């Protein structure tokens, strides 16, 4: 049986957590919300997980790889925010601070799925 790595922090797919990101230049950094992208099996037993950083700067160019969250309070956010799928990254679980919300509605999850499929060209080569 696999042993759970970090019993204190239990992120799940779709949740939004506050996180300290270590990026530089145009890579998102600092203390910000992130969307948990990796699956729950990975999240339960791995020391790392995949996340999508969010930004509150809504004046960026509208790209098909961005998902705007105008109904921000629904997700536990303080301001309208954008998921930036081009900034998807792997982090250590212990860099998560606390959970602020969850994106669980099918409409928004479908928009995230489309943005990810465009960013990573998942279906372009099948």
Q: What positions do the PLM features span?
A:
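Short, charged beta-turn/beta-strand-edge "cap" motif at the junction between a beta-strand
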Residues: 22-26
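Short, surface-exposed loop and linker segments with low hydrophobicity and enrichment for Pro/Ser/Thr
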Residues: 8-11, 42
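Compact nucleic-acid interaction/catalytic patches
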Residues: 27-31, 36-71
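C-terminal terminal-subdomain/extension
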Residues: 2-3, 9, 72-126
